[in-house]
């Protein structure tokens, strides 16, 4: 974890661009500007430790080295012009060409004719505006001063501000006249750009003031470069290590000595060297102490990143080179050589720095200027127009004052906004400081509370331990007295116990003899009761065992019938497939016979055969059709039989399930009765509680036995009824086959009627056969209803499902039988269609 938060890229960029002469106020103004524009709020880094104390300078220095924000000459940008030889000339040219007071309001797109007309009608045309009336002379002067201060790159305005400090009030009025003349020169230059035929006169220039300002500015820039101020970066704690980057202070005296190539005395050099060495020792001691304090919080076992170590080594070598005497001597020699080259190559220096020549030139210029009495104190506006400064001032006030008034209003509004933002930031910082103090107080209070509670707990613990010890001592004394009393009592009880044991042994012997005699008599009586109870239990449970054996036998017969039905179903399916194959063969024979008939018809037309031969061929066709109808009838009957067998198999499965449940129920009842018998025998009762049996089973044991006897008779009659039903089905099949053979073999009956009768008989067989089965099913269900209530409900469900299975075959064509059979084979239940079958029965 770092000691301070990382600096963002935009902050590093701003740090690199700050000049050496800047101070901490630049960071404050930049933060205010950022708040004013509302771009992003600067986040202050954490420069405090977790305990609330400030970080040391060594910690801040290491953190800056870590994040690469340490201010050094290698990271600072160059200030000033690119060519050092032409620095003074560049400053003079900038001061001459820069026109900050008029440039912002110059209108380049105005027609020159309109400018001439406005200048001629200047005194008459005056704009009355509330904004211009509100502005006073003092506000204008303050605006001009503020503009001259706010223009950062105007060397002339800075030189003008420097000269104002030394000149008197008359020079201030002259400087104002120069500003008006500069405005007029700009206006004349603009008009001259539009009208190239007029040659403007050369501009007047006070070279003395410009050169003095340029020299001062150049001197200040050189001083800033040689003695850069160590900035405090906008972040961290402010330190007092400013101005220690260089050992020498390049003052005016030093610069004069350098320019004059005069060496300093050796004694002064020795004194400076001693002073520097003493300062170095003090610094080294201070840094060693700081490093020792900083090393306490560091981990010596951790490895430093190679890149960071390499950067730190390069920075140390660079800083050591900056403070070495060899570098300084080489730099001084380079500066001397460069100054010599500048003096030799700079021809303008001989011209502009020669005061006598400049004075003579100024005197000549003034004499030439005084000769022009006609245009004295007037400005050439171009096109032969000369105006006085007062007229130009009026025209400029008419054009510029509204704009200046609006600018002043906006500036005042912006100023008020800046003040409000500053107040808000101050209030926010104040509240933040209060909150931080509150947090610190909370932390300290928490620590105090912890210490106080710990002390209180210790005191309470001591007092409670003392109380417990005292109570324990009292308890021990009290218990000792009780133990002594109990020991005496124990001795008395032991003596009494011995006497009581002797007495009880004698009583136990007598009681044991009496109990042995009673037990022998009671055992004989219990054996006699058990034999009698077992006989009664066997008599009562005999019908239940018989009922269970009959139910198991019935279940076995039903399973065998189901297997027989499944075998019959598989046989009928094979027969159906065989009949379908024969029908397809008969169809092919019919197609072949049709083709043969066509050929025979053609032959009859050609050869004229007799009628008998043709009828013989037609009789063959009729025989084939009869055989086809016969096979279709057999197929329909077998499909109906298959469907009925499917229904019977479902009924048998349901009956087997019902019998299984009945068997389980009877087993449970049997186990219940056996349990009740055991309970009664254990209690010594002769009979079972009949009321309890009636509550559990719904009837008494005698009623249950009589009912089970009737159920046994019905179970014995069931296989005889099934055999009768199967015999009736076989007789009906034989009758249908005989009728078909008679119809197919008759000579006098036509083929169409024979086929119709075969289909009708098959449908009649289909309708009669289920009706008889329904009646038989109803009879059997009626018998079962008379016997048992619970078995009646199951038998009703079976009879209804049987009716549903039989009624589904009523009025169904042979084509639809295969579909319904496939539905049954897929496992469709019969009970789901009971409502539809009941509606069909009503119809």
Curated annotation (Swiss-Prot):
Start-end of Basic residues biased regions: 33-44
Keywords of this entry: Acetylation, Cell membrane, Membrane, Phosphoprotein
Modified residues (Phosphothreonine): 720
Membrane spanning stretches: none
Residue spans of biased composition, Low complexity class: 752-764
Feature: compositional bias, Polar residues: 127-137, 163-174, 798-810
Phosphoserine: residues carrying this PTM: 2, 88, 130, 182, 401, 584, 710, 763, 775, 816, 828-829, 838
Residue segments, region Disordered: 13-44, 120-174, 717-843
A UniProt-annotated Pfam family: Eisosome1
GO BP field: eisosome assembly
Topology class, membrane: Peripheral membrane protein
InterPro entries per UniProt: Eisosome1
Gene Ontology CC annotation, any one: plasma membrane
Modified residues (N-acetylserine): 2
Cell location: Cytoplasmic granule; Cell membrane
Comp. bias intervals (Basic and acidic residues): 781-797
Predominant subcellular localization, coarse grouping: cytoplasm
Function: Required for normal formation of eisosomes, large cytoplasmic protein assemblies that localize to specialized domains on plasma membrane and mark the site of endocytosis.
Protein name: Eisosome protein 1
């Amino acid at each position: 974890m770092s000691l301070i938060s990382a600096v963002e890229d935009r902050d590093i960029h701003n740090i690199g661009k700050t000049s050496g002469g800047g101070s901490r106020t630049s960071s404050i103004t930049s933060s205010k500007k950022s708040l004013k524009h509302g771009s992003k709020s600067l986040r202050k880094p954490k420069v405090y430790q977790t305990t609330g104390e400030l970080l040391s300078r060594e910690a801040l220095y290491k953190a800056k080295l870590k994040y690469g924000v340490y201010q050094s000459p290698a990271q600072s940008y160059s200030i000033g012009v690119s060519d050092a030889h032409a620095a003074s000339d560049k400053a003079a040219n900038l001061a001459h060409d820069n026109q900050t007071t008029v440039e912002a309001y110059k209108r380049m797109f105005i027609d020159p004719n309109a400018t001439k007309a406005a200048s001629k009608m200047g005194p008459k045309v005056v704009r009355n505006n509330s904004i211009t009336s509100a502005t006073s002379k003092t506000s204008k002067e303050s605006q001009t001063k503020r503009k001259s201060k706010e223009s950062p790159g105007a060397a002339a305005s800075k030189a003008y501000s420097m000269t104002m400090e030394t000149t008197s009030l008359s020079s201030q009025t002259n400087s104002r006249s120069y500003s008006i003349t500069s405005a007029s020169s700009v206006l004349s230059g603009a008009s001259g750009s539009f009208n190239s035929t007029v040659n403007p006169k050369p501009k007047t220039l006070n070279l003395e003031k410009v050169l003095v300002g340029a020299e001062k500015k150049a001197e200040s820039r050189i001083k800033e470069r040689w003695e850069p101020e160590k900035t405090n970066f906008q972040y961290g704690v402010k330190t007092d290590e400013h101005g220690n980057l260089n050992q020498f202070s390049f003052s005016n005296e030093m610069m004069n000595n350098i320019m004059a190539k005069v060496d300093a005395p050796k004694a002064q050099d020795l004194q400076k060297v001693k002073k520097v060495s003493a300062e170095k020792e003090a610094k080294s001691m201070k840094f060693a102490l700081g490093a020792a304090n900083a090393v306490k919080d560091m981990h010596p076992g951790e490895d430093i990143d190679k890149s960071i170590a390499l950067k730190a080594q390069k920075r140390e070598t660079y800083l050591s080179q900056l403070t070495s005497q060899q570098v300084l001597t080489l730099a001084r020699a380079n500066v001397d050589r460069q100054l010599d080259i500048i003096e030799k190559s700079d021809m303008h220096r001989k011209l502009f720095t020669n005061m006598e020549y400049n004075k003579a030139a100024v005197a000549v210029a003034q004499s030439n200027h005084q000769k022009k009495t006609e245009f004295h104190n007037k400005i050439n506006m171009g096109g032969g127009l000369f105006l006085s400064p007062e007229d130009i001032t009026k025209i400029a006030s008419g054009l510029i004052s509204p704009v200046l008034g609006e600018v002043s209003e906006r500036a005042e509004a912006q100023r008020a906004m800046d003040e409000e933002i500053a107040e808000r930031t101050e209030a926010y910082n104040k509240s933040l400081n209060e909150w931080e103090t509150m947090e610190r107080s909370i932390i300290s209070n928490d620590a105090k509370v912890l210490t106080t509670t710990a002390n209180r707990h210790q005191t309470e613990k001591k007092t409670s331990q003392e109380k417990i010890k005292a109570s324990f001592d009292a308890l021990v004394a009290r218990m000792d007295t009780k133990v002594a009393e109990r020991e005496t009592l124990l001795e008395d009880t032991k003596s009494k116990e011995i006497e009581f044991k002797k007495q009880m042994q004698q009583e136990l012997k007598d009681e044991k003899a009496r109990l042995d005699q009673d037990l022998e008599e009671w055992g004989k009586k219990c054996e006699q009761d058990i034999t009698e109870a077992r006989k009664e239990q066997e008599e009562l449970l005999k019908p239940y065992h018989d009922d269970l054996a009959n139910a198991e036998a019935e279940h076995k017969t039903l399973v065998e019938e189901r297997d027989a039905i499944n075998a019959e179903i598989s046989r009928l399916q094979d027969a159906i497939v065989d009949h379908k194959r024969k029908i397809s063969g008969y169809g092919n024979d019919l197609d072949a016979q049709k083709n043969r008939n066509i050929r025979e018809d053609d032959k009859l037309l050609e050869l004229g055969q007799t009628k008998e031969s043709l009828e013989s061929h037609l009789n063959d066709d009729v025989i084939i059709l009869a055989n086809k109808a016969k096979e279709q009838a057999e197929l329909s009957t077998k499909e109906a039989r298959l469907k009925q067998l499917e229904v019977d198999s479902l009924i048998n499965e349901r009956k087997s399930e019902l019998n299984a449940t009945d068997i389980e129920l009877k087993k449970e009842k049997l186990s219940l009765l056996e349990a009740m018998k055991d309970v009664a025998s254990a209690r010594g009762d002769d009979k079972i509680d009949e009321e309890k049996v009636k509550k559990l089973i719904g009837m008494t044991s005698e009623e249950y036995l009589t009912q089970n006897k009737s159920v046994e008779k019905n179970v014995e009659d069931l296989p005889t009824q099934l055999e009768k039903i199967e015999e009736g089905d076989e007789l009906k099949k034989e009758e249908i086959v005989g009728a078909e053979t008679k119809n197919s073999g008759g000579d006098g009956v036509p083929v169409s009627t024979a086929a119709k009768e075969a289909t009708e008989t098959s449908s009649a067989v289909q309708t009669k056969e289920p009706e008889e089965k329904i009646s038989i099913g109803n009879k059997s269900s009626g018998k079962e209803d008379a016997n048992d209530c619970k078995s009646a409900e199951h038998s009703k469900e079976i009879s209804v499902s049987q009716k549903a299975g039989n009624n589904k075959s009523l009025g169904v064509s042979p084509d639809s039988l295969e579909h319904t059979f496939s539905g049954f084979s897929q496992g469709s239940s019969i009970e789901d269609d009971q409502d539809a079958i009941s509606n069909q029965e009503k119809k």
